[in-house]
């Protein structure tokens, strides 16, 4: 039904791995588009950093001809997403209009079931209320809860 509304189209993001330099510009863009707050150094040390895209680094070749390869890992917008049915308050659900996985932040009660069920480990729990200092609050996306 959702694919009928979208003419059979599904959303995804394509990355040319031969051109990826690991610069993390995609991570910054994702934070800006989805109102994800920047994590402090302390949060990163505690393993509580908010990031929806992570960049995996792999080494290829042997010394002295070693090359770093980067693999961005992000939400795959699964058609039958394992993160959706486990949420007891339906904070994680599949939009039938856009055919994408959506999370309603202010509905989340923090069970973290969605993060535990995500095979790509991109669902995270926001441990603190998001804080955007001036002038960062001016850039928030009004279409995101």
Feature map (PLM): residue ranges:
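Non-ligating segments of multi-cofactor redox enzymes
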Residues: 1-145
